[in-house]
Swiss-Prot record:
Keywords on record: Apoptosis, Autocatalytic cleavage, Calcium, Cholesterol metabolism, Cytoplasm, Disulfide bond, Endoplasmic reticulum, Endosome, Glycoprotein, Golgi apparatus, Hydrolase, Lipid metabolism, Lysosome, Phosphoprotein, Protease, Secreted, Serine protease, Signal, Steroid metabolism, Sterol metabolism, Sulfation, Zymogen
Family recorded in the similarity comment: Belongs to the peptidase S8 family.
Role description: Crucial player in the regulation of plasma cholesterol homeostasis. Binds to low-density lipid receptor family members: low density lipoprotein receptor (LDLR), very low density lipoprotein receptor (VLDLR), apolipoprotein E receptor (LRP1/APOER) and apolipoprotein receptor 2 (LRP8/APOER2), and promotes their degradation in intracellular acidic compartments. Acts via a non-proteolytic mechanism to enhance the degradation of the hepatic LDLR through a clathrin LDLRAP1/ARH-mediated pathway.
Native source species: Ateles geoffroyi (Black-handed spider monkey)
Gene designation: PCSK9
Entry domain remark: The C-terminal domain (CRD) is essential for the LDLR-binding and degrading activities. The catalytic domain is responsible for mediating its self-association.
Transmembrane helix is among the record's keywords: no
Name the UniProt record assigns to this protein: Proprotein convertase subtilisin/kexin type 9
Glycosylation sites: N531
Residues at the active site: D184 (charge relay system), H224 (charge relay system), S384 (charge relay system)
Subunit structure: Monomer. Can self-associate to form dimers and higher multimers which may have increased LDLR degrading activity. The precursor protein but not the mature protein may form multimers. Interacts with APOB, VLDLR, LRP8/APOER2 and BACE1. The full-length immature form (pro-PCSK9) interacts with SCNN1A, SCNN1B and SCNN1G. The pro-PCSK9 form (via C-terminal domain) interacts with LDLR. Interacts (via the C-terminal domain) with ANXA2 (via repeat Annexin 1); the interaction inhibits the degradation of LDLR.
Amino acid sequence: MGTVRSRRLWWPLPLLLLLLRGPAGARAQEDDDGDYEELVLALRSEEDGLAEAPQHGATATFHRCAKDPWRLPGTYVVVLKEETQRSQPERTARRLQAQAARRGYLIKLLHVFHDLLPGFLVKMSRDLLELALRLPHVDYIEEDSYVFAQSIPWNLERITPARYRADEYQPPNGGSLVEVYLLDTSIQSGHREIEGRVMVTDFESVPEEDGTRFHRQASKCDSHGTHLAGVVSGRDAGVAKGASLRSLRVLNCQGKGTVSSTLIGLEFIRKNQLVQPVGPLVVLLPLAGGYSRVLNAACQRLAKAGVVLVAAAGNFRDDACLYSPASAPEVITVGATNAQDQPVTLGTLGTNFGRCVDLFAPGEDIIGASSDCSTCFVSRSGTSQAAAHVAGIAAMMLSAEPELTLAELRQRLIHFSAKDVINEAWFPEDQRVLTPNLVAALPPSTHGAGWQLFCRTVWSAHSGPTRMATAMARCAPDEELLSCSSFSRSGKRRGERIKAQGGRRVCLAHNAFGGEGVYAIARCCLLPQANCSVHTAPPAGAGMGTRVHCHHQGHVLTGCSSHWEVEDLGTHKPSVLRPRVQPDQCMGHSGASTHASCCHAPGLECKVKEHGLPAPQEQVTVACEEGWTLTGCSALPGTSHVLGAYAVDDTCVVRSRDVSTTGNTSEQAVAAVAICCRSRHLAQASQELQ
């Protein structure tokens, strides 16, 4: 795979030291800075006093980028288990160095992580991977890989709500209470657009540029970062004109960086946050590389510390879940649209899409600061520009409500977006139902959102077609899982259920025999002071429907689901509501376990809406009225031809097979049933604040 295999040298350590001290030994090293010599000298005491670990099989796992040209063999991030002590990374690194030296290998320790995640970055032969994976405390090892900048004035008008548009862009505030960290190339901080608004930190961690003839012209090295800084907070073309920026250089003059450099940059931010806590922080990640477990884990750690991370979805016209940091659930991932609200096309490529994208934003022909001169402007395109727009909007939202959590901010961004404006035909057919049809916009005002019950739909990864395959969707830690549904393109599924896992509730969907796979779909809501539970009824006797309702007084029904434990063809009727009989009851097939999701929260009230047509339809929908939020979606009555039910914003969608091939009769027509809820408590509290 492009890696040079090192020769095994079984020389005594003193002889190895003499060779390293000589000129020939120095020339043989990959680095010429003398660090290897100091390393081996330091290992004498380690080798004398440290017994080698028993040769057990490796329990840790190894990960590398799926795209071979992006890989960096020879550099590895070693991640330790979470419960390890703060001093453990250094101790484990020394142990690895000592054991490698006994085998005739040298390891260069490049960085030790403490504040972001426990681990270290090393340069070593791939021959040592098996040894490293067997070390105690090691959770996994990831090979380093490249990340890339994602760039290839209608934009300001587009993010302003229509009812507030005027002749010029007039944001509700400038985002002055928020600090935005930009991980990018270097920045021309003297440009008139961003002068006095950007602090260029001393952080720099970039790989060498490709090619010996590449000239590091300032205008090339600064171009990407300068443009994005102008989009976020530029005087004339910026979104959040009052936000302050701090730049970290993690991309070289060609717009290329590494996963390890990005990790070190994120740790730099975390260290600053610990040393000098400030107000809300937004981190803009206008870059993308192959899927990286360690980079996603680092984003998760930073998000838990209260930092909002906004990332480019990527410009590869591909599933964003295949790239990092776009695939990290804790990151707000942004795709790119043009002035007509259509997905951006960049030659043969274009914006990424799929379930890992949260929303889209302007990303084509965006005017911003140019590094060619201090008064120059340039037009650029890509998901980097789209992410910069959302970072600016987030800065303004956080300035208006500094106490917003990541979950609350994400829900507001989704709620206030322009909906159903993107032509879904641009996306691959299998991605259309997974990709959000949302274009970012500012909220209509800085107040008045507190009364709203916010919910979003979270899709799982595809389960795969194996016989007993399952899919799992989960909400963010600050969100409540109010309902669970499933979807299968073949229609063969064994239903879904809510299950407790690791102290949290998750939505599980089950594939059926002969099925092509299934998706789990979670409805995740912000419901303060909620007390939620799931009540289950086992399968009823033959010919009898299974019924279940909320047992506790004051609890209301927010969703229904059911599943079959025994193997079948997935043709049983799914759980359904009978709103005309008992609106707080779920009813399912006699062979299925039926589950009622019930919640109690101050002022929470829910109702059921049903919509059906007398003739079979491939899709039936029912929507909640304004002021009500969809929490549950199911089919009524449900037949073998139902593919599944899912929520799109506040609309319940029930999909069936193509009626031209199924031979449906009018008696088999499917109706959509929505559970719509609102919180009178939140509305009252909002009115009192006003």
